[in-house]
């Protein structure tokens, strides 16, 4: 004979009840179910049954027609009996019973009409805990009594909108009364204060059964008080987040025939506050999700194909995803969109940014460097092509609204500031620079950017890879900050040139140049003294000229051989034995050979004075012994290089090269 199993839940009781009806599952009705529950006040309950809806899936359906057939799942019926609002029984039996004759009522944690299954309330215990000395008849009687008391209490709480103290005064009972009314008032409150806990503990009874029940009820209320406060705090949080993060549910169907993998990583976010769910952690390039573009990191994964991901652990979600991807056919992902995880246009909270001290000098230099940048309209007017200057392409690439994602990235637990991915650079070049017929040409262009120093790898790799992180090179980022005084203060990095001589002194430039120099500027005072002149022995001039040559050898390798010759010439300046001097070609100047006698004859007065009185300035009449060859028109007389004292030859040669070849002299900073 066919029979039907009906599993029903009574309010928030943890353990469900099971009854069997001698009726086929497809023929069982609500009237058959109520006949089995004849010992319960079925007229005071609403009947909800587990049912399947085409739009929402599994739901709880209320059935009130006695002739309606009950929905059946796997040969059984699942039902919930919820106390109806306004239902109450005879109130006279409540006032006549003493408090010690009744067991404690059930502890209610949900509101009226709460149709959640009992699994949502794991801390609720049965009302008959610790009452093993009752008989079956006493249990049934006390069960009916507590039902009546609870219905009366809830009716009074709903119809009376006054606080607990007002209701107590309306009843006319003192605060320490041990009557049923006071007990119901305490149990119906959401938060039990310490004084009410004390009054509850002072309610004594002659039976051990009632005392143990009171202790259990008091313990439950304390736990319930803490849990409700946590729920209140969480509800205040949700009221804030719901107003700012409204969800938008999107269903995305992916064609897995064009892509080899799904390309997502999922993260489980379960915690004590119940904020559970499976979230999209990251999206990998080349996958089906990245190609679609509608799913972003931070979205909540609700359903994949027909599998619901709610209340699913992270391991189960990974297993289900792998099984679905291994199958053929399209995949449908249902996600709840969240707000932008990386907002750019509205408020942001820089939680991950470190706090750095402010350097005023660096801030000023950075501001000054920005003032020398190219105007925006010049960059926007001229479109970028493959023939454009690489520096201009890189400058446009670094603009905030260029479309290239430049941000801090993590690599091997190292933060790389303002880094880009090689694949993004290639895509940006292929999209924004004209002249590339295919993408691999843009990749070659990106490789040339790395080769010329516009891009720089973290570990200085010279080969370009689309999977690596790159930063912009110092050549394009620090070019605006360069100036002529940016060298170090060491003597080996600077040219030590003697200042211009006194206007009354002979002009040091010879007639070897095809053009004439103007006279010295009138800014020098009449009493100007040349501190670069060496009045000591010949070795002093050699040291000074030697210092002036060292910077040239370090700054430009092309002038190293000429400077080495100058150093040798300066070292032998005291003897006057060297007469062959060379200069760089291409500037129109010539150096003429002079006999050794001319050098020794021109330098003999200064050499004798230096030998007789080292470290003392010679008398001025000695300057008249120089041979005057000629000078620029309107300027002082000019003497030949051979007439210059040997200890000053090296410094004067360096000065002549600087004045005669200015382009070569400043070629180091280009």
UniProtKB/Swiss-Prot annotation:
Transmembrane segments: none annotated. Residues 142-151, 215-228 have a biased composition (Basic residues). Keywords: Cell membrane, Cytoplasm, Cytoplasmic vesicle, Developmental protein, Membrane, Phosphoprotein, Ubl conjugation, Wnt signaling pathway. It is a peripheral membrane protein. SMART domains: DAX, DEP, PDZ. One of its GO terms (cellular component) is cytoplasmic vesicle. GO terms for molecular function: frizzled binding. Ubiquitinated; undergoes both 'Lys-48'-linked ubiquitination, leading to its subsequent degradation by the ubiquitin-proteasome pathway, and 'Lys-63'-linked ubiquitination. The interaction with INVS is required for ubiquitination. Deubiquitinated by CYLD, which acts on 'Lys-63'-linked ubiquitin chains. It comes from the Eukaryota. Residues 400-474 form the DEP domain. The modification Phosphoserine is found at residue 194. Residues 152-171 have a biased composition (Basic and acidic residues). Residues 89-237, 518-642 are annotated as: Disordered. Residues 176-192, 200-214, 526-555 have a biased composition (Low complexity). One of its GO terms (biological process) is intracellular signal transduction. Residues 1-85 form the DIX domain. It holds the Pfam family Dsh_C. Interacts with CXXC4. Interacts (via PDZ domain) with NXN. Interacts with BRD7 and INVS. Interacts (via PDZ domain) with VANGL1 and VANGL2 (via C-terminus). Interacts with ARRB1; the interaction is enhanced by phosphorylation of DVL1. Interacts with CYLD. Interacts (via PDZ domain) with RYK. Self-associates (via DIX domain) and forms higher homooligomers. Interacts (via PDZ domain) with DACT1 and FZD7, where DACT1 and FZD7 compete for the same binding site. This is Segment polarity protein dishevelled homolog DVL-1. It comes from Pan troglodytes (Chimpanzee). The gene is DVL1.
């Amino acid at each position: 004979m066919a029979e039907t199993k009906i599993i029903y839940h009574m309010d928030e009781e943890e353990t469900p009840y099971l009854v069997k009806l001698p009726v086929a599952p497809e023929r069982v009705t609500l009237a058959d179910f109520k006949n089995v529950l004849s010992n319960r006040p079925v007229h005071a309950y609403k009947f909800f049954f587990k049912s399947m809806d085409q739009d929402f899936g599994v739901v709880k359906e209320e059935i009130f027609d006695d002739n309606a057939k009950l929905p059946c799942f796997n040969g059984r019926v699942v039902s919930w009996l919820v106390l109806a609002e306004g239902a109450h029984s005879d109130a006279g039996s409540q006032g006549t019973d003493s408090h010690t004759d009744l067991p404690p009522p059930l502890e209610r944690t949900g509101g009226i009409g709460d149709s959640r299954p009992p699994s949502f309330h794991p801390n609720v215990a049965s009302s008959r805990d610790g009452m093993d000395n009752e008989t079956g008849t006493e249990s049934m009687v006390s069960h009916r009594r507590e039902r009546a008391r609870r219905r009366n209490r809830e009716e009074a709480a709903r119809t009376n909108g006054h606080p607990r103290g007002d209701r107590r005064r309306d009843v006319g009972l003192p605060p320490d009364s041990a009557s049923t009314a006071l007990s119901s008032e305490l149990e119906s409150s959401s938060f039990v204060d310490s004084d009410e806990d004390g009054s509850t503990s002072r309610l004594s009874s002659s039976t051990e059964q009632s005392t143990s029940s009171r202790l259990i009820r008091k313990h439950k209320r304390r736990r319930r008080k803490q849990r409700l406060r946590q729920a209140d705090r969480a509800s205040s949080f949700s009221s804030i987040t719901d107003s700012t993060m409204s969800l938008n549910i999107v269903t995305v169907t992916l064609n897995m025939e064009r892509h080899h993998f799904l390309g997502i990583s999922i993260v489980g976010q379960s915690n004590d506050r119940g904020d559970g769910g499976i979230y999209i952690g990251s999206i990998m390039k080349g996958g089906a999700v990245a190609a679609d573009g509608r799913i972003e990191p931070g979205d909540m994964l609700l359903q994949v194909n027909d599998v619901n991901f709610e209340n699913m652990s992270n391991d189960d979600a990974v297993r289900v995803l792998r099984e679905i991807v291994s199958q053929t056919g399209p995949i449908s992902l249902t996600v709840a969109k969240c707000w932008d995880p990386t907002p750019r246009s509205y408020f942001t909270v820089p939680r991950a940014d470190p706090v750095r001290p402010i350097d005023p000098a660096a801030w000023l230099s950075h501001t000054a460097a920005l003032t020398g940048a190219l105007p925006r309209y010049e960059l926007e007017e001229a479109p970028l092509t493959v023939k454009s200057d690489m520096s201009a392409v890189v400058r446009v690439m670094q603009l905030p609204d260029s479309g290239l994602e430049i941000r801090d990235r993590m690599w091997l637990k190292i933060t790389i500031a303002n880094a880009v991915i090689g694949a993004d650079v290639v895509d940006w070049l292929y999209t924004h620079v004209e002249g590339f017929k295919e993408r691999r040409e843009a990749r070659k262009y990106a490789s040339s950017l790395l080769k010329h120093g516009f891009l720089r790898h973290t570990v200085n790799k010279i080969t370009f890879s689309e999977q690596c992180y790159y930063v912009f090179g110092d050549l394009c980022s620090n070019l605006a900050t360069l100036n002529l005084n940016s060298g170090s203060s060491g003597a080996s990095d600077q040219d030590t040139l003697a200042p211009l001589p006194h206007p009354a002194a002979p002009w040091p430039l010879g007639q070897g140049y095809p053009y004439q120099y103007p006279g010295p500027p009138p800014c020098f005072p009449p009493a100007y003294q040349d501190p670069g002149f060496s009045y000591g022995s010949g070795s002093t001039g050699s040291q000074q000229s030697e210092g002036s040559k060292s910077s040239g050898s370090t700054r430009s390798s092309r002038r190293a051989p000429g400077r080495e010759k100058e150093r040798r010439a300066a070292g032998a300046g005291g003897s006057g034995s060297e007469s062959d001097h060379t200069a760089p070609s291409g500037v129109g100047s010539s150096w003429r050979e002079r006999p050794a006698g001319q050098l020794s004859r021109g330098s003999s007065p200064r050499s004798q004075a230096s030998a007789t009185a080292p470290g003392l300035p010679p008398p001025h009449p000695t300057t008249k012994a120089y041979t005057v060859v000629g000078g620029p028109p309107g300027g002082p007389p000019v003497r030949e290089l051979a007439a210059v004292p040997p200890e000053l030859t090296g410094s004067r040669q360096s000065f002549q090269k600087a004045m005669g070849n200015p382009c070569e002299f400043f070629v180091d900073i280009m």
